[in-house]
Amino acid sequence: MGAYILRRLALMIPTIVGIMGISFLVIQFAPGGPVEQVVAQLTGQGDSASDRLSGGGDLMGQSGGFDESGSKYRGAQGLDPELIKKLEKQFGFDKPPLTRFLEMMWNYIRFDFGDSFFRNSSVIDLIIDKLPVSASLGFWILIISYVISIPLGIKKAVSDGSTFDVWTSGIIIIGYAVPSFLFGILLIVLFAGGSFFDWFPLRGLVSDNFDQLNWWQKIIDYFWHLTLPLIALSLSAFATTTLLTKNSFIDEIKKQYVVTARAKGLSERKVLYGHVFRNAMLIVIAGFPGAFISAFFTGSLLIENIFSLDGLGRLGYLSVVNRDYPIVFGTLFIFSLMGLVVGLLSDLIYTWIDPRIDFERRDV
């Protein structure tokens, strides 16, 4: 097991380098950049969101074409070339791409993520500041999905092939197939003052007068704001855990020890929860870390933007739009590293739950 852990840890290095390298390369060829952002502001261009996404008006990428004045940044005509050089030095673009990448990776290895280009704060402080919002979404989605999915999966396994099983499978698959942001938009239209009811707030995690509320009013206000985002995210979170639980129970129910337990006269409930449950839930429990990371990082980006929740997903989106590269690459590095570590942790949990799994190589 020790050798397996060392191999996995060693593989994390080229994996991280590959992820960061490909992302860095894509950024180099993408239109726009922080220099163009400042140039666009100085020249009065690129005020709209669509302009920002395309790099600001008719501005070109970092490696884009030249304008009539000889600058490699379109829209920079009329600006002092020394100012352009200062901007390049400020954002680090006075160095070759390979040098910038190597310096960035060296800093990240030391967990030095630098400062945001436009937010006057360090990347790590911004992540810590936005973390509670995303953590709240991820935590409650995970709890809700497991609390509902496990009993539902057991019920589907017991009634495999029944009308209940068929209909719930259809509903689960539809919920999984439809993107969560579409559910979010539908919920806003229906229940957040869109066209029908105005029952829930449209934006934010808490009300403006949150600090003036007493403790129980704060709890109600907090969940009142979370209701629609959680519903939108949870509808697509049930499928994997529910079907995994169902299939795991079906596999266990067919085994000989279940037949023996029933032959002894044990009730079906005793067989299911006294014998089958412990074995069937091993794979579900072992997947808990991976499910947490999935709920924590992947599902909330669009939901945070739709409901104006100031979390990591919204931070990442705005950073990409504004070409704030330290935040983009810093969050990518942290999330990639956490994903790899959690993947290793999931494998170790498998071995802890089921000692028959050891991941050791055996000669045939």
Curated annotation (Swiss-Prot):
First-listed, main subcellular location of the protein, grouped into a coarse class: membrane
GO biological process: microcin transport; peptide transport; protein transport; transmembrane transport
GO cellular component: plasma membrane
UniProt keyword annotations, A-Z: Cell inner membrane, Cell membrane, Membrane, Peptide transport, Protein transport, Transmembrane, Transmembrane helix, Transport
InterPro entries attached to this UniProt entry: MetI-like, MetI-like_sf
Membrane-spanning ranges: 9-29, 134-154, 171-191, 219-239, 283-303, 325-345
Topology relative to the membrane: Multi-pass membrane protein
Record note on disruption phenotype: The deletion mutant is hypersensitive to ampicillin, in a manner only partly dependent on the beta-lactamase AmpC. Deletion of the yejABEF operon leads to the accumulation of anhydromuramyl tri-, tetra- and pentapeptides in large quantities in the extracellular milieu. The yejABEF mutant displays cell swelling and lysis as well as a severe growth defect.
Superkingdom of origin organism: Bacteria
Signal peptide from the UniProt entry: none
Places the protein is found: Cell inner membrane
Family: Belongs to the binding-protein-dependent transport system permease family.
Subunit and partners: The complex is composed of one ATP-binding protein (YejF), two transmembrane proteins (YejB and YejE) and a solute-binding protein (YepA or YejA).
Physiological role: Part of the ABC transporter complex YejBEF-YepA involved in the uptake of muropeptides, the breakdown products of cell wall peptidoglycan. The import of muropeptides into the cell enables peptidoglycan recycling, which is vital for cell wall integrity in this bacterium. Is also probably part of the ABC transporter complex YejABEF, which is likely involved in broad-spectrum peptide import. Responsible for the translocation of the substrate across the membrane.
NCBIfam families per the UniProt record, alphabetical: PRK15133.1 (NF011712)
Designated name of the protein: Peptidoglycan transport system permease protein YejB
Gene that encodes it: yejB
